[in-house]
Amino acid sequence: MKNSNRLILFTLLLFLGGIAKAATDVDTLQTCLDMKGKVPPEQALECYNQKAQELLTKKHPRSFRIARDRGIAEEWAPSDEPVRVYKQNYFLVYSHSSQPNNAPTSPNPNNQVPYTYALDKNEVKFQISLKAHLLGEDKHALWFGYTQLSLWQAYDNAHSNPFRENDYEPELIYSYRPDNLALAGATASFLNAGLVHQSNGQSLPKSRNWNRFYIQAGMERDFGDNGKLALQPRWWKITGGDAVDDDNPDIAHYLGHGEFEARYYYGQGALSAIARIHSLQLDLALPAPRMLGMLIQNANFHLQYFNGYGETLMDYNQRHRTYGFGISMPFE
């Protein structure tokens, strides 16, 4: 792919949010136009007035402070929205690795990937994560979640800019939200139980996958003007697999049996950390420059740092450091 093609693709990604928003605005006003001649003029005028107020509100992206007023418990509250944000959604236009995994290995001899060429240390990294409400109301709800992490060798023109890894992660989640349960100075927000499958969708020898059952708790503490802290520890049990067919039989040694996620919101910024037994990922989201905010509603400038094992499934037993920057969308 030529440099110009990459520029076009990235430009389309930037404008996608603005185009979608403009289409929604047109549909909104069309509702009022369709009322012409069917209702009294006063009622049609009131429709325009109401829709105008809604559109003006959309012109000013909500800040992290506004979004966080609801608390993380509301992230698991059933609503009329067919699709909701799940984990962090970001697009890093530049991600640099200290040590690319040129020949991925595994204790399973069927999963030894031979060396072909040296990967580019610079690439594009992005994650899409959404969830949908299936059943239940109020305190008890069943959700379907989907997360995809992709690493794209967009700057490697010599090898046709391949995607070196795509990790697909569907899951089924039961969520319980207690009523204002205080715990060690914080508020217990939710208790989730889930079944998750993660795979890179590759055939042998590049195939990597694992299945888990997990329990996750969410708690939050509001410090008023000093921000808000959300803690989300998760423990998992690896299921399935055997010594013969398991693509990555020693994955627990590198990724452990759980992770600890912390998010701190202050003003219009957010810092999040995900820690496992042998890895740490830090994400910092800050208000985007005005021009970018006009193109993509609610977009943030995003910085990311990763150190350890398991940035992707293919790299589950490869230790390296990466850092990158790009844009992200806020948590709900």
Regions found by a protein language model. Give the residues of each.
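Outer-membrane beta-barrel "beta-signal"
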Residues: 169, 282-286, 320-332
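N-terminal signal peptide c-region/cleavage motif recognized by signal peptidases
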Residues: 17-20
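Bacterial N-terminal signal peptides that target proteins for export
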Residues: 2-8
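Outer-membrane pore/translocation modules
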Residues: 99-113, 120, 135-267, 275-277, ...
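Cleaved targeting-peptide boundary
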Residues: 22-29
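A cross-kingdom marker for long, charged
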Residues: 55, 302-304, 308-313, 324-331
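Outer-membrane beta-barrel initiation region
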Residues: 33, 38, 42-158, 167-170
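Glycine/small-residue-rich hydrophobic helix-like segments
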Residues: 270-299
